[in-house]
Amino acid sequence: MSEPLVIVGNGMAAARFCEELVERACGRYAIAVIGEEPRLAYNRVLLSSLLADEVSAADVELRPARWWRDRGVTVLYGQPATAIDPAIRRVRLANGASIPYSKLVIATGSRPIRLTAPGMDLRGVRVFRDFADVADLRCAAKGARAVVIGGGLLGLEAAYGLVKGGAKVTLVHLMDRLMERQLDARSADMLAREVEARGVEVLLGAETTKVEGIRRVEGVRLADGRVIEADLLVVAVGVRPNTDLARAAGIDVDRGIIVGDGLQTSVADIHAIGECAEHRGQCYGLVEPAHEQARVLARRLAGVNAHYRGSALATNLKVSGVRVFSAGDFLGAAGTEAIVLSDPGLKTYKKLVIANDRLVGAVLFGDTTDGPWYFDLIRSGTSIDAVRNELVFGRTFASLPADCPQNNHDEKLGNEPPERAASLTYAISN
């Protein structure tokens, strides 16, 4: 008889875990997925494209209903879990039902961070996190005067989508550059100019102190006294792990649900993966680590002695229509050397950081074709001494030895082939 396995959460981590588990242990488990949102699992990365009307709702769905049925997976979407009872091994639902489990996987993701400035409870204040948020913003965008708070990925994508939807948009960011965790000063400046060219006003070093209005948003007040008129405010200042169910069940929680290398929580037969999990003090909040955790846990529950050791991080994204990539120490610590290649004509920028004949960091803007290959070099620690002079021009121009890591991600990412610049700025600094 199949063991009852329950997954709380129906996002990208849960979907990947199901895919991996049914492939490796078909029939071993009777799988039930509990989802808070009233729809099947979807690709959250594409929400910005959905907001910008570049893809359809069908395009963001990860798997059709038939796929889940054919593999014997029961999906209870639109039925939030309200409690986990480890003593009797049951999950309670909002409708009063409860589901038994032999093994439980918590994949509850994260929640948007809410600001506490006065006026944040007014009508017209929105977040940008899930499918319902996209639907709300698409309805509100036409002709709106919108302010987006947050210059990270979510804020930029919200601003871009709102402009495409017909809104006049001002983006307000507390820090002195956009995407400060993923980009250096120069690439962030290039991004700001590209975002403004697409119709978004960008205000950096700007702190929001109050939302003006009586019943609904009328404006946003900044610390310097300026007031930006607005009837729509989107708060996109980050997310935090959704740990409520785990904490209430007595599972150890810090910032996220604490897991070991086996993705096991402090309670027997309860695991956690994705944005809600904290491994070795790290909460990732990114898709690829969630997928890696899902693969490891599926292997373990299929009887394989697999372990999760953490994830090397890289950013490879399309932000407001512009491709950006970063990995490793792209800012350059003391004792490192930076090689920079810039082409204002093609609006491309590449910075490689080298230490002890090893590539330790990279940031790319505009053309990210070689990003995954650089990431392989960073992770492997391969000596780049033999191709040092050609490395900045990309894999096509750097004839590495056969045993060096090769990038096999290009087809998956759909990157365009590299273009050569007519005029380049090439610099080395240390």
Model regions: which residues?
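FAD-binding core/adjacent interface of flavoenzyme oxidoreductases
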Residues: 1-6, 61-147, 221-223, 234-236, ...
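Mid-to-C-terminal Rossmann-like scaffold of FAD/NAD(P)H-dependent oxidoreductases
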Residues: 2-4, 23, 276-372, 428
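Beta1-alpha1 glycine-rich phosphate/pyrophosphate-binding loop at the start
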Residues: 2-74, 161-182, 373
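Glycine-rich Rossmann-fold phosphate-binding loop(s) that bind the pyrophosphate
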Residues: 9-12, 129, 149-152
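A Rossmann-like FAD-binding core segment of flavoenzymes
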Residues: 30, 75-92, 99, 165-260
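FAD-site-proximal beta/loop scaffold in flavoenzymes
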Residues: 121-142, 213-221, 226-299, 386-392
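Rossmann-like NAD(P)H-binding beta-loop-alpha module
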Residues: 136-183, 217
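Cysteine/selenocysteine-centered motifs that mediate thiol-based redox chemistry or coordinate metal-sulfur cofactors
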Residues: 137, 384-430
